Amino acid sequence: MYLINLLAMIIPVLLAVAFLTLLERKVLGYMQLRKGPNIVGPYGLLQPIADAVKLFTKEPLQPLTSSPMLFIIAPTLALTLALTMWTPLPMPYPLMNMNLSMLFILALSSLAVYTIMWSGWASNSKYALIGALRAVAQTISYEVTLAIIILSLLLMNGSFTLLSMTTTQEYIWLLIPSWPLAMMWFISTLAETNRAPFDLTEGESELVSGFNVEYAGGPFALFFLAEYANIIMMNALTIILFLGAYHNPMVPELYTINFTTKTLLFTAFFLWIRASYPRFRYDQLMHLLWKNFLPLTLVMCMWHVALPIMLAGIPPQT
């Protein structure tokens, strides 16, 4: 039974990821005044299936000087972590209702750094290693602001459970009282998922393809799936934290429709940003975080700590 539950979550996520790649290519195509994929199937709808067949039937080549064990473990672990992060998300009911679901997601997203680091190191290539080092520095840096923003929101929520976020936001979205946090959170999720304009790890112009330069076929596809699963997961998390969907226990389907629509809109926003903005320089990326976001988030966190204490003496206004 547990296996069926797990598969009922994993398979739709992988399908969503497959068609997100198609959507991205279509959106970028139309933004650059061209068609995008339109040969395989009607309007190119079967392109993801063709891509999957092509990638998984290719020979998984390995460089002679690589560490074979780590080389294979890294992409497998990347996808495993990306899919495990979906388990505590309430949609409207989570697969695993944990007390510390928010901490669980933070811990797993920090573990994802290791997969990138191992893949860069195991490839035994200069480009891959530079890409991996950049990714590690970037991800660890932006984890800091993500953690502080989450802490501020949890102070308003009153618990670490994601399920209670829907109850907190019954009257007002948390986006409205904490919009500076939401703004910084969104930019940090872009950096966390290595998306443009923060895609320094895959800098085609200077690093060929970044940490996955030596990967081909199946293992490359696993990295690709992990990246896009993380993108959708981060957007889903943004919706849960800031734009809580209205949940009525009598009709839980409404929540799912509401939640999915918002997540898709945010994902489209990610693609729009990719088509519009140039890549940051590495020092600009670090300056943005350590000199702009970190002081601001710390101030906001102190404000959220002080607010309940300041207002504790006021009787409830009913």
From Swiss-Prot:
A single GO cellular-component term on record: mitochondrial inner membrane
Pfam families noted in UniProt: NADHdh
Catalytic activity: a ubiquinone + NADH + 5 H(+)(in) = a ubiquinol + NAD(+) + 4 H(+)(out)
Record-level GO BP terms: mitochondrial electron transport, NADH to ubiquinone; mitochondrial respiratory chain complex I assembly
Main location: mitochondrion
Gene Ontology molecular-function annotations: NADH dehydrogenase (ubiquinone) activity
Keywords noted in UniProt: Electron transport, Membrane, Mitochondrion, Mitochondrion inner membrane, NAD, Respiratory chain, Translocase, Transmembrane, Transmembrane helix, Transport, Ubiquinone
Topology in membrane: Multi-pass membrane protein
Subcellular location: Mitochondrion inner membrane
Record flagged with keyword Translocase: yes
InterPro entries in UniProt: NADH_UbQ_OxRdtase_su1/FPO, NADH_UbQ_OxRdtase_su1_CS
TM spans (from-to): 3-23, 69-89, 102-122, 144-164, 171-191, 222-242, 253-273, 294-314
EC number: 7.1.1.2
Keyword Transmembrane belongs to the record: yes
Function according to Swiss-Prot or TrEMBL: Core subunit of the mitochondrial membrane respiratory chain NADH dehydrogenase (Complex I) which catalyzes electron transfer from NADH through the respiratory chain, using ubiquinone as an electron acceptor. Essential for the catalytic activity and assembly of complex I.
Self-association state and partner proteins as the record states: Core subunit of respiratory chain NADH dehydrogenase (Complex I) which is composed of 45 different subunits.
Family of the protein in this entry: Belongs to the complex I subunit 1 family.
Protein name, entry field: NADH-ubiquinone oxidoreductase chain 1
Gene: MT-ND1
